[in-house]
Amino acid sequence: MTQFIVLLALYVIIGSVIVLIVAKRKQTQEEFFIGGRTAHWIVTALTYAATTYSAFMMVGLVGMAYGTGLGAMIFELVYLAATVLILVVYGKRIWHLGKTHGYVSPMEMFADRYGKLTEALGAIVAFVALIPYASVQVIGLALVFGNYGIGFVAGVTIASLIIFVWAFLGGLRGVALTDALQGFFMMAVAIAVLTWTGQEFQGLEMSTFPNQVWTPLFFINITLPWAFFALTNPQVVQRLFIIKDPAGIKKMIILFASFGLVYTVIVSVVGFAAKAGTLEGILPMIEDRDTVIVQLMGRMGAVLALPLGLSIIFASVSTSNSIILTLASMMTRDVFRMRKNMIIGRVFTFVMTLLVFLFSLLRPDYLVELSVSSSRILLVFLPLYIGLFHWKLGGVCAGVFTVVGGAIIAVLVNVLGASLGSIYTFIGVFVLFFIGALCDRALD
């Protein structure tokens, strides 16, 4: 435990020094929330990767691969392929809109077409969806801390404090710089863990696909919201505002795709190897699959377990910082419409972190399922983006109907536990968009 605390303290000190250096700059909202649109393509790719590949991966996906087999890896690879396709098709368009109109919050893209009410309601819906998703990161951290004798509540508290201080002081520029360093570290540790599992366990247990868990309908239901993650999740859309030069977007996509492919395969194989270890009698049967990585860390020597714990912390802090900053930018600019005042932005950074802290204490579900539930709610933004870039129909009614009605559908299917909830939500948001478009046409 002492070694872990020392390494954790060193990590916090180094990150805080970077953040404090950045904090000395005079920060406008554009500087604080999107780094003044000056990020290099390498930094953009690594912060995009570190934001995306969070505790969901090394904690959630390892456990999912252990518990459900090959379908877990296919599910994540479908996400990666869809994300790369979305970035290729929409990356430059979104960057151009942000640069031309001075957008800082992703919801600002909707204001001219769908009205300021849609912009504000969209920010509120994103807030409802992303607080649980951010809590996934904090819960993942607390589980890792537990391996070193730190209680769950204490772990949640420590994680929340790190997230708050870095986001509050450094803004996006500080977060992006730490992300770039963390991205390299995460990959190096993942490769080391893969090497260790290959030596520790004999073979892989991947099950088959489809299987009893990964039925075709279940696969579609869980993958559908994830496939559109790059368009529907505001924190990753906002990342496209930060890159300095549109010529770097192609390079950024290639680097991100390469990182994502290697990291996904490694993480999945670790889960498959752990399941083989259970079948061989080396590991016990692990009922709570979110603790698989913790069980593995208990078997590793400190030389590997400590860096692995830190890599999960890195990924979780990165994603949480991004979400907190994006939510703060939306509440500041889209709901309260304060586009010059930096104080309110920092206040919302504190409020968002506090809410994430409180929600994390509940630990409501498995990390992967909680992430998918959040992404399901965010499907409400998909028709709005499609309409913005491809259709001429749709105005205020289309925007409001889709955001409000779609969010209600998503929450209801989550509460009712509908087995095809993502499919119902996907169909529902498009139906609502077209009904709203007809209403707009009638009012015109």
Describe the residue ranges of each PLM region:
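Hydrophobic, small-residue-rich membrane helices and short re-entrant helix-turn-helix hairpins
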Residues: 102-111, 171-180, 232-265, 281-292, ...
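Membrane-interface helix-loop-helix modules in multi-pass membrane proteins
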Residues: 34-101, 224, 236, 246-282, ...
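Helix-loop-helix module between adjacent transmembrane segments
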Residues: 15, 74-167, 225-226, 314-322
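A generic transmembrane alpha-helix motif of multi-pass inner-membrane proteins
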Residues: 1-21, 396-444
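Loop-to-transmembrane helix boundary motifs in multi-pass membrane proteins
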Residues: 116-120, 329-365
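Hydrophobic alpha-helical segments and their helix-loop junctions in multi-pass secondary transporters
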Residues: 17-25, 91, 131-138, 147-158, ...
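Select transmembrane alpha-helical segments in multipass membrane proteins
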Residues: 41-48, 85-86, 116-129, 158-159, ...
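Membrane-interface "cap" regions at the ends of multi-pass membrane proteins
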Residues: 1-59, 167-173, 189, 246, ...
